[in-house]
């Protein structure tokens, strides 16, 4: 429910190359609230793979619905409170993700601590896009580490293993998206893994008040 202290704002997005839209938004009183990058690594031949943190191991995730829901819930938990602007964690969105034709849990890299998911990368290959643009690109769709397992090098370990997984699937480049202001240092992690900024986009906000 809205309260007297709830911040309210109009919001929209624009890619960096849309200069006309940027000028229009500025004239309308919008300000850039956040920067988002798509990052690319163009060579998967040589990947520095660090050791896994002690007590953790990489194991497959089941294709069955309960296993996929366990992974979904772990991902949602990891991003809750850290994901700027919110995200759709609804059951309907989970069901849509399961129905995606490019959904392939065999590409995922999941770190386990016993029966608990400590972190993971949901990798994907967009087959139709690759065919249309004659490329072999894989995506690190989501990268997450749950709070009890952070600051141990797990993020670097699963990102590197994801690059290897995509290479083994026949890809020669990898992409991911990142919030430049991610509070857990995701941008630096990806830069150290060999990613460079490929495209930029802006999140715009313009505050407004509601008459009460």
Language model region names:
Residues 1-62, 202-206:
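Acyl-donor-binding surface of acyltransferase catalytic domains
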Residues 82-143:
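A conserved beta-strand-loop-helix scaffold within acyl/acetyltransferase catalytic domains
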Residues 159, 182-186, 203-208:
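Short glycine/proline-centered loop/turn elements that form peptide/ligand docking sites
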Residues 1, 141-145, 151-168, 173, ...:
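Conserved acetyl-CoA-binding loop-helix of GNAT-fold acetyltransferases
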Residues 10-12, 140, 174-178:
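Conserved hydrophobic beta-strand within the GNAT/NAT acetyltransferase core sheet
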Residues 21, 25, 190, 195:
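Conserved active-site tyrosine of GNAT-family acetyltransferases
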Residues 50-89:
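Short amphipathic alpha-helix that is part of the acyltransferase structural core
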């Amino acid at each position: 429910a809205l309260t007297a202290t709830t911040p309210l704002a109009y919001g929209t997005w624009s890619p960096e190359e849309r200069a006309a839209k940027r000028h229009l938004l500025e004239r309308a009183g919008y300000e850039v609230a956040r920067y988002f990058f798509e990052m690319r690594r163009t060579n998967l031949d040589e990947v520095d793979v660090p050791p896994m943190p002690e007590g953790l191991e990489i194991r497959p995730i089941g294709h069955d619905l309960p296993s996929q829901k366990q992974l979904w819930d772990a991902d949602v938990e990891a991003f809750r409170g850290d994901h700027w602007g919110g995200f759709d964690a609804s059951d309907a969105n989970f069901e849509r993700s399961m129905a995606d034709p490019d959904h392939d849990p065999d590409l995922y890299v999941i770190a386990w601590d016993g029966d608990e998911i400590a972190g993971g990368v949901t990798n994907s290959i967009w087959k139709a896009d690759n065919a249309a643009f004659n490329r072999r690109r894989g995506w690190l769709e989501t990268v997450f580490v749950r709070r009890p397992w952070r600051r141990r090098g797990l993020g670097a370990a699963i990102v590197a293993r994801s690059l290897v997984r995509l290479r083994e699937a026949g890809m020669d480049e990898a992409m991911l998206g990142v919030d430049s202001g991610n509070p857990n240092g995701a941008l630096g992690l990806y830069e150290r893994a060999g990613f460079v900024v490929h495209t930029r986009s802006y999140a715009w906000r313009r505050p407004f008040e509601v008459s009460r």
